[in-house]
């Protein structure tokens, strides 16, 4: 059994300065009835805590560390860029080069707006969908997490398809009612909800592989059904690939389900 004496001490100190001692609820370890472990360094597939215990890292910082920790090629690239400055508050050619690489990897992408978090990405996508369609309703799926977006922090009530109820204090009920949550991979639940709200349906948002409930993949037939119905209805289908992009495959989870009709060059 590992000893985490220093982690416990650091946790008590952190609680003096941060609510709950952490900056993200998932780091609190409350779901497993434990205390957070404080890490101090990482190398390759391993992370080391403040007590110098060594762990195999199966999380990878929730996705981005796919090349391992302290990868020498990454360290060199970061160090080289640091010599040129850290932030300009203005455009740089690196943005365009990065966008071009991303577009080459994910052919469904036509244009890119870069943001600092998954929450900003989903919030912007929802706002754009509502603005473009001039509709209000959003369909999401149980177990899919899309960040700290007010309209998406909801859970479903009883029944196969219900209007959302606020899942966190501070979210107005009227706002939550614009979001309907359906059971993941349940075609009947989706179709029932879709028929009820399609005239005011701006978008359907989904994690093609639901990370927060055990990495359950959406079935190909289910995901294709979402594409088919949203296209017919002129609603937007949003794939939240914050966790799956470039990891499940270079083209993201959407590449693994092989939808040619997700491609940007699709013709009717």
Please provide the spans of the model-predicted regions.
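Active-site-adjacent loop/helix segments that line or gate small-molecule/cofactor pockets in enzymes
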Residues: 2-41
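Active-site and channel-lining beta-strand-loop segments
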Residues: 37-57
